[in-house]
Regions:
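N-terminal (or domain-start) structured segment
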Residues: 21-114, 161, 178-204, 297-298
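Surface-exposed aromatic
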Residues: 154, 289-301
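Short, low-complexity disordered leader/linker segments with a strong preference
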Residues: 1-33
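Short, polar/charged alpha-helical segment
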Residues: 46-64, 166-175, 216, 283, ...
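Solvent-exposed coil/turn segments that connect beta secondary-structure elements
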Residues: 97-99, 123, 133, 211-212, ...
Length: 301
């Protein structure tokens, strides 16, 4: 029943985690290593989450056996998730709402039913960015230019349509009275390619998570026009919210962890215990503060 509950939460929040009843788990689990699959490139959101897990589990000695992060790039996460599906209970993958929307949009045959949900871990906020040389200075200017020139206003998103970056901007557009079907989205493999496209004026703006944009913002390569949080964030107080700029949108981007479909109840209980210790540790809480992520933990039980 806990497993079903986590799945329900995933789906109800645009997410993925389960609904299962309390059962005793007496059988020992023989797991001698951990492989965390990040279904995108190093430095992207899923990868940052995977490496945060690796760092915390090792530093806190919660999992003392070898831990590796494997980057499997392609298919808007599909390549990494297909890889995970074929593995055993020692292989876990980072996920997000894209696992669900890939299937709904016809981009993948995979569904949440092909995996075992283990936990929701943390959440991030969405931002919209432009190049440092852009004449757009705030969110209202951005949306007005977009509204007047929809066919020629190009918006970058990675790694695919249907992810939270895409969906958050769709929500903003609807709130501003723009039909999202008329928007020109350009899909890139990763955020680095989006930044290059902004610099080279191939796109006018881009949507991504704050943790992905922050480094480029602090180095002066981009401007962040709005953040999807309910109020300004302490670590970047100069960035206004959509809401204070007259666009009533709040959008939270979640990150989760899952395993292959055929995990045993003992394996699920084992990882449940490990992950719970991880999110309660000082190291994990420090990473959340450092990256501006919000605690969003919900275990499989």
């Amino acid at each position: 029943m806990k497993k079903r509950l986590l799945l329900c939460i995933w789906i109800m929040t645009g997410v993925i985690v389960g609904c299962s009843s309390e059962k005793s788990h007496t059988n020992k689990v023989n797991i001698d290593k951990l492989e965390i699959v990040a279904p995108n490139v190093q430095g992207a959101g899923w990868d940052l989450t995977a490496r945060a897990m690796q760092k915390t589990l090792a530093e806190e000695k919660i999992f003392t056996k070898p831990i590796t992060v494997t980057n499997k790039v392609g298919g808007s996460g599909d390549v990494g998730w297909k890889y995970t599906k074929q593995k055993g209970g020692h292989v876990l993958a980072i996920n997000s709402s894209l696992l669900i929307t890939n299937n709904l949009l016809g981009h993948s045959k995979l569904t949440y039913k092909d995996f075992t949900p283990l936990a929701l871990l943390a959440s991030d906020w969405e931002v919209v960015v432009v190049s440092k040389d852009s004449n757009i200075e705030n969110a209202n200017e951005l949306m007005e230019q977009l509204k007047q020139n929809k066919k020629n206003f190009n918006i970058g998103v990675a790694p695919g349509l249907g992810n939270d970056d895409h969906l958050s901007f769709v929500q903003v557009s609807k709130a501003f009275g723009i039909n999202p079907a008329e928007l020109q989205f350009f899909v890139y493999e990763n955020k680095e390619k989006i930044i290059n496209a902004l610099t080279n004026k191939q796109i006018n703006a881009a949507t991504m998570t704050l943790s992905e944009a922050e480094k480029q913002y602090k180095s002066g390569k981009i401007k962040i026009l709005a953040v999807s949080a309910p109020k300004r964030l302490d670590r970047l107080p100069e960035i206004p919210t959509w809401k204070e700029q007259g666009i009533n949108v709040i959008f939270q981007h979640w990150k989760g962890i899952m395993g292959p479909k055929d995990m045993t109840e003992e394996e699920v209980a084992y990882w449940d215990s490990i992950i719970k210790k991880m999110v309660e540790s000082d190291s994990w809480k420090g990473i959340l503060r450092e990256r501006g992520w919000e605690s969003f933990y919900k275990g499989s039980g």
